[in-house]
């Protein structure tokens, strides 16, 4: 019996890293970006200590981006604004879902209940641009084996 070839072609310079290892890379990258983001937010308050923060709970949430690698392989030829929008919507969904799960044990490290453009306490619509860009970064990051080929 002859096996049918996959319809998604993997390019030569593309992801071969095992999923668990990529999960670790995505978790670390997510932590780093969150620490940088929260550090730069301190500048708005004129606090030049630039103290960045994150939560241990965020590591597995960020790590789950590794599971998007098959999607990135399929969508990488689509129009860039369409891809970015799709990725932002997926991140909004992941943020909502992980927020709901962590909320059950009162462990959610973020609270948007006082923010202007929020959907419930877990999603901020004004983060759309952040998630659009983060999704495009993750596409490149996961398809290039995380930190190994970045």
Language-model features and meaning:
Residues 2-150:
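Aromatic-rich, lipid-facing transmembrane alpha helices and their immediate juxtamembrane interface loops
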């Amino acid at each position: 019996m002859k096996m049918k070839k996959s319809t998604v072609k993997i390019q030569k310079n593309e992801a071969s890293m095992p999923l668990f290892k990529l999960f670790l890379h995505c978790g670390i990258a997510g932590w780093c970006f969150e620490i940088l983001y929260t550090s730069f937010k301190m500048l708005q308050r004129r606090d030049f200590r630039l103290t960045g923060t994150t939560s241990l709970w965020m590591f597995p949430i960020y790590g789950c981006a590794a599971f998007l690698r098959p999607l990135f392989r399929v969508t990488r030829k689509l129009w860039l604004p369409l891809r970015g929008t799709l990725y932002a919507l997926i991140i909004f969904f992941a943020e909502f879902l992980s927020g709901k799960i962590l909320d059950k044990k009162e462990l959610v490290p973020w609270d948007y209940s006082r923010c202007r453009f929020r959907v419930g306490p877990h999603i901020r619509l004004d983060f759309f641009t952040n998630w659009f860009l983060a999704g495009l970064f993750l596409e490149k990051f996961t398809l290039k084996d995380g930190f190994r080929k970045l």
